[in-house]
């Protein structure tokens, strides 16, 4: 600790302690699960070609009769504009002149201010991506709060691909509900509606705290694990995350891995929290291979040096005023999260 003039009496000194830093919670479950694959486009839009394969069922005919004939696969093209997101900051001499550095007894420097600005910038980009991906999973729409692309109402992946969102009410407030039957509805729907050429072998449910708590305390679940000696021992200890960080409780039941996601966007400690998963809801997705089912497309920056180049996840540029009066930091990211197979995202409700 170093002595500094007291704030109450300029003729006295007090010790400056180590700083107490309050940091917003940082969430990134979609990144940890690897739900979205990443693709990079060189243009400001992406065009998806949908090819629908088909097979025929042969019938017997008399010899010499006209043969059954085949046909080619169906296909159609869809084009979607990539939204443009920007976040800028700047530094002036007044931000440094005569200022004490954060948590130190030295004068502020340009490098320290720049480092803080870039740290906040990186955090903003990461928070935006997590919020955007969860928004797409929960609503079936890309994150475009101002609807700058997709018309007045924006894109809706269920409408764009001609699918209907499947929902299952787990009726967790009813003590006699058969949870396994409810889980089987989700599993059967994914198997029947996959159309990916693959097999849905397991399922992940990203749950709100309310859904998760009602699930693990439901009488049929408690009874099923009453005499189960192995992990998880839900009757004797708090569930713990396996493979993720300890904030994410998880519970495997009925071929579904339920993960509690308490996360939400909160710009500053104590500020308003915009939850990722609405209260009492859960989002069910296939447990593996989702990087080909759900995609994040990145487009290039709006700069000459990046024209027609593969898009990066984020860009940052620094410009110094020729007169030395300010330093400007520009950043941007251009992305769209697409549910290529929206029918494989199932909405679950606690009641």
UniProtKB/Swiss-Prot annotation:
Function text: Assembles to form an icosahedral capsid. The assembly is primed by the interaction between capsid assembly protease and portal dodecamer, and major capsid proteins assemble cooperatively to form the procapsid with the help of capsid scaffolding protein. Major capsid protein forms hexons and pentons of the icosahedron. Viral genomic DNA is packaged into the procapsid through the portal vertex. The packaging triggers a dramatic reconfiguration of the capsid shell.
Assembly and interaction partners: Homomultimer.
Pfam families, alphabetized: Phage_cap_E
Keyword GTP-binding: no
Keyword DNA-binding: no
Main location: virion
Assigned keywords, A-Z: Capsid protein, Host cytoplasm, Late protein, Virion
Gene Ontology cellular component terms for the protein in this record: host cell cytoplasm; viral capsid
Protein's name in the database: Major capsid protein
Compartment(s): Virion; Host cytoplasm
UniProt record similarity statement: Belongs to the lambda phage major capsid protein family.
InterPro entries documented for this protein: Major_capsid_GpE (IPR005564)
Disulfide bond annotation, renumbered to this chain: none
């Amino acid at each position: 600790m170093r002595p500094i003039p007291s704030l109450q009496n300029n003729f006295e000194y007090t010790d400056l302690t180590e700083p107490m830093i309050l940091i917003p919670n940082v969430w990134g479950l979609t990144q940890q699960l690897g739900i979205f694959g990443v693709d990079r486009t060189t243009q400001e839009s992406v065009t998806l070609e949908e090819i629908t394969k088909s097979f025929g069922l042969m019938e017997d005919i008399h010899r010499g009769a006209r043969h059954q004939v085949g046909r080619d696969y169906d296909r159609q093209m869809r084009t979607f504009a990539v939204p443009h997101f920007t976040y800028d900051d700047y530094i002036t001499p007044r931000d440094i002149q005569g200022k004490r550095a954060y948590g130190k007894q030295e004068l502020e420097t340009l490098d320290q201010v720049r480092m803080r600005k870039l740290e906040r910038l990186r955090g903003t980009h990461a928070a935006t991506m997590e919020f955007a991906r969860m928004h797409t999973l929960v609503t079936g729409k890309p994150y475009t709060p101002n609807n700058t692309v997709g018309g007045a109402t924006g894109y809706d992946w269920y409408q764009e691909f001609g699918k209907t969102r499947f929902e299952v009410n787990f009726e967790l407030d009813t003590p006699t509900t058969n949870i396994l039957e409810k889980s089987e509805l989700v599993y059967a729907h994914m198997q029947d509606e996959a159309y990916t050429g693959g097999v849905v072998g397991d399922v992940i449910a990203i749950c709100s705290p309310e859904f998760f708590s009602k699930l693990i305390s439901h009488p049929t679940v408690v009874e099923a694990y009453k005499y189960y000696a192995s992990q998880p021992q839900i009757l004797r200890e708090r569930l713990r995350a396996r493979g993720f960080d300890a904030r994410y409780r998880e519970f495997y039941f009925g071929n579904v891995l339920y993960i509690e996601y308490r996360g939400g966007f909160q710009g500053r400690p104590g500020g308003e929290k915009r939850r990722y998963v609405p209260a009492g809801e859960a989002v069910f997705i296939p447990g593996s291979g989702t990087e080909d089912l759900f995609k994040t497309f990145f487009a290039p920056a709006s700069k000459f040096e990046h024209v027609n180049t593969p898009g990066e996840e984020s860009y940052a540029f620094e410009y110094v005023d020729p007169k030395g009066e300010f330093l400007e930091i520009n950043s941007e990211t251009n992305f769209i999260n697409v549910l290529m197979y929206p029918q494989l995202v199932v909405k679950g409700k606690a009641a």
